[in-house]
Swiss-Prot record:
Binding-site list for GTP: G14, P15, V16, G17, S18, G19, K20, T21
Name of a matching Pfam family: cobW
Keyword Chaperone on entry: yes
InterPro entries per the UniProt record, alphabetical: CobW/HypB/UreG_nucleotide-bd, P-loop_NTPase, UreG
Entry protein name: Urease accessory protein UreG
Length: 206
């Protein structure tokens, strides 16, 4: 999954407003000095997420590429991933030493999944603001992603969410698959996600 076999491809999915772009930004800033990193963002009709990452200086602009998927965003990460595979190939041409590519999906529902041809690892982001019941509703993003990120844990008291219930439901729905609570704006929970990526992505620890 590392250089010999091409870069490690990490899919980041989740509903609109859950924190996908913030997670992508935090991961890029944490990893960019240790690894060669690039990002592909998916939006339906714009390149807004790519622009956000560029403005936040998550990476240099030539390492950020936005693709406009049109229609349903899940099609570009699952049924027909060609637009993303072409973007990854272009990033490989630009940066032959590329080690990590993040593929951020457009906002989608709990049924969104990444094609195994596109992503080696998948991170799925939900927000406590969506409701305490989200983990137990299931769906492939909840049950089959490699790591489930439950974001905006700091807002739980304000939206009347019991994090203990969410934790129990997530554990029950995911079995042995890992998950974690995050407050991405403050960076809480990010180190644990990075540890997971390095350990499970075949990366050399640096």
């Amino acid at each position: 999954m590392t250089q010999k076999n091409g870069p490690l491809r990490i899919g980041i999915g989740g509903p609109v407003g859950s924190g996908k772009t913030t997670l992508t930004e935090k991961l890029c800033k944490a990893l960019r000095d240790k690894y060669s990193v690039a990002v592909i963002t998916n939006d339906i009709y714009t390149q807004e997420d790519a622009l956000i990452l560029a403005r936040s200086q998550a990476l240099s602009e030539d390492r950020i590429m936005g693709v406009e998927t049109g229609g349903c965003p899940h099609t570009a990460i699952r049924e027909d991933a060609s637009i993303n595979l072409q973007a990854i190939a272009e990033m490989n041409r630009r940066f032959p030493d590329l080690e990590i590519v993040f593929i951020e999906s457009g906002g989608d529902n709990l049924a969104a999944t990444f094609s195994p041809d596109l992503a080696d690892l998948t991170l799925y982001v939900i927000s406590v603001c969506q409701g305490e019941e989200i983990p137990r509703k299931g769906g492939p993003g909840i049950t089959r992603s490699d790591f489930l990120v439950i974001n905006k844990s700091d807002l739980a008291p304000h939206v009347h969410v019991d994090l203990d219930i969410m934790q129990g439901d997530a554990a029950r729905m995911r079995g042995k698959r890992p998950f974690g609570f995050t407050d991405l704006h403050r960076g809480k929970g990010v180190p644990e996600i990075i540890d997971f990526i390095v350990e499970n992505g075949g990366l050399e620890a640096r």
